[in-house]
Regions:
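Flavin-dependent oxidoreductase catalytic cores
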Residues: 2-131
């Protein structure tokens, strides 16, 4: 089962993202997630994966690519935060790493967990292979 959060690509007036940076494919400007909402979202990924495991799925893929919420956190272009979730590459990677850590805790070591991650996002000021 694949788990993803659309982030700023959500076509909804209440969409959220790491920062209030509008997507070129949606008419809605996202609301920046609060620190509490970031932690709640991490917990939601882990809970969703645990529910999939309980439902009998063989594995879970957490979508960390294609420009969705996780990629938005890793890219300096879409993550302009100044707290522990933004700024340096290490801080921007905290969100996906915490999702994987918490999800692995919830699933145990023997359940299949995959996580594709974009190394490039092909936008000016975004992810480059160098990071």
């Amino acid at each position: 089962m694949q788990i993803l959060h659309a982030g700023r690509y959500a076509y909804h007036p209440l969409c959220v993202a790491p920062s209030a940076v509008k997507s070129p494919i949606s008419p809605f400007k996202p609301r920046a997630l609060s620190g509490f909402a970031v932690r709640r979202t991490i917990a939601a990924y882990a809970r969703c994966a645990a529910l999939a495991q309980r439902a009998g799925y063989d594995g879970v893929e957490i979508m960390g690519s294609e420009g969705y919420l996780i990629t938005e956190f890793t890219s300096a272009r879409t993550n302009t935060r100044t707290d522990r979730w933004g700024g340096s590459f290490e801080n921007r990677m905290r969100f996906p790493l915490e999702i994987v850590r918490r999800t692995r805790e919830a699933l145990g070591r023997d359940f299949l967990l995959t996580f594709p991650l974009s190394a490039l996002d092909l936008i000016d000021g975004g992810l480059t292979g160098d990071e």
